[in-house]
UniProtKB/Swiss-Prot annotation:
Mn(2+) binds at E68, E101, H104. Homodimer. This is R2-like ligand binding oxidase. SUPFAM superfamilies: Ferritin-like. Probable oxidase that might be involved in lipid metabolism. It comes from Mycolicibacterium gilvum (strain PYR-GCK) (Mycobacterium gilvum (strain PYR-GCK)). Keywords: Iron, Manganese, Metal-binding, Oxidoreductase. Its EC number is 1.-.-.-.
């Protein structure tokens, strides 16, 4: 595609108050280096766990690192879709988004190395059919589709798949599991810091996905149906992944229950409908500077902090 102009040279410059560029600035301000996280105490804590506890936590970590790797590889077409739409601010933010996903892959691998897990972990995913369908089929298919069809409808489907269901349900539920394991027992301080850092990054990722869907729903109400249909298609798959993981164990370690995690995941998924619905009929100019998507993710984080503090 030939370049005909540079948006950064346009009269008035860039709108730094637009949500994508606010997210971009936030990522710059909160930059962190995986090499700065101290994993030195985690090895002893890890070895103090029972064999079943280590197996459960290894599977959880395998799900995370494979997911981070998948998004690092699959997110590129969304950048191209933003370029095709002429949205430089979104394209700038997505370059940061992709970098952060690569960094998340790095830091989970560093943690595995630090606690001495160096064997092939692929088998931990072979037992999770819903996970494999989500990450091996639904995610690449929905994002790859943007390479040939960058339409609003395709963008909404891709955003629902990754930002709302994978990040907004599955990953949030996984972070909650790590908090329950680590905070309740006062163990694995390196993992606690890792999850805190990644969670902060991914709140911005989810906010961008919510913003993107709200933008398209405000522009064309037919996109609300696209959002609803894709959410209703994938939410059962996300909940099935929790069932699959818990079903592998006769006794669930760490005092966790499947009911707690199913309720947690379902709550995070269902509350996203209202935030998208609130954009219907709104002027696009308002949506661009409406920080509701970020406030939603911050409220989820605040609720988790309070719940975990109460259980500690």
């Amino acid at each position: 595609m030939n370049r005909t102009r540079s948006d950064s040279l346009a009269a008035g410059g860039l709108n730094w108050d637009s949500l994508p560029l606010r997210l971009f600035a936030g990522g710059n301000a909160k930059f962190w280096d995986p090499a700065d996280i101290d994993f030195s105490r985690d090895r002893a804590d890890w070895e103090s766990l029972s064999t079943m506890e280590r197996d459960w936590a290894t599977r959880l970590c395998a799900e995370f690192i494979a997911g981070e790797e998948a998004v690092t590889q699959d997110i590129q077409p969304f950048m191209a879709a933003m370029r095709a739409e002429g949205r430089l601010g979104d394209e700038m933010y997505l370059t940061q988004f992709a970098f952060e996903e690569a960094k998340h892959t790095q830091v989970f691998r560093m943690w595995l190395d630090a606690v001495g897990i160096t064997e092939d972990l692929q088998g931990y995913l072979d037992d999770l059919p819903a996970y494999r369908q989500m990450f091996y089929e639904e995610l690449p298919a929905s994002l790859d589709a943007l390479a040939t069809d960058p339409s609003p409808q395709a963008q909404v489907r891709a955003s629902v798949t990754y930002n709302h269901v994978i990040e907004g349900m599955m990953a949030l539920t996984g972070y909650y599991a790590w908090h329950r394991i680590c905070v309740d027992r006062h163990i694995l301080p390196g993992m606690q810091e890792l999850v805190r850092r990644i969670g902060d990054d991914e709140r911005r990722h989810m906010a961008w996905g919510t913003f993107t869907c709200r933008r398209h729903v405000a522009a064309d109400d037919a996109n609300w149906t696209v959002f609803e249909d894709r959410m209703n298609e994938l939410i059962p798959l996300a909940l099935q992944n929790t069932d699959d993981a818990f079903a592998l164990y006769d006794e669930i370690p760490f005092g966790l229950t499947i009911e707690e995690f199913q309720q947690y995941a379902a709550d995070k998924g269902m509350r996203r409908f209202g935030t998208i619905s609130s954009a219907r009929g709104r002027p696009l100019a308002e949506i661009d500077v409406d920080y509701t998507p970020l406030h939603l993710e911050d409220s989820f984080a605040d609720e988790d902090r309070k719940a975990l503090a109460a259980s500690a």
